[in-house]
Amino acid sequence: MTDAEIIRLVQEADLDELISLYAHYTAAENLPPLSSDQVQKIWREIERNPGVDYYAVEIEGRIVAACILTITPSFIRGGSGYGVIEHVVTHEDFRRRGLAKKLMVFILDHACTEIMLLSGRDLAPAHKLYEDLGFDKHRRTGFIKFRPKN
């Protein structure tokens, strides 16, 4: 990591930048943008939940990559809990620089003993990164169900 790259927790003051960064993620999934009120409500929920953290890569004061890590307490594996990483995103102008890898390595070095990761099916470069970091796509099978929109 260069001196210009900082990996850190996202703070409330970063929310506008984080939401702008996630436009790169949500556009691919054709998701509508959140209102300011929705963003603030979600942030308050995150602040109240000690097991949820957003991590970011900052370069020259700008957030250019981020993801969320959720750690859930567990009675398995000595009570160390398990983590789930989701919503890994890098700003399109900063891709192919190894920033997502640095972010993931940081999290893997500082989190619990078991970490799962969810990724879209058609993201071959991201999947290669995750496999290079030791994630095993054959170890378990994941299922996702979305609630119908009202």
Outline where the language-model segments fall:
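A conserved beta-turn-beta hairpin within the catalytic core of GNAT-like acetyltransferases
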Residues: 73-85, 95, 138
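A short beta-loop-alpha structural element at the N-terminal edge
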Residues: 6-20
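Conserved GNAT-fold acetyl-CoA-binding loop/helix
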Residues: 23-43
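A short helix-loop-beta-strand connector motif used in the catalytic cores of GNAT acetyltransferases and
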Residues: 44-56, 84
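Conserved active-site alpha-helix within GNAT-family acetyltransferase domains
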Residues: 101, 117, 121-139, 145
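Conserved beta-strand in the GNAT
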Residues: 56, 62-71, 84, 89
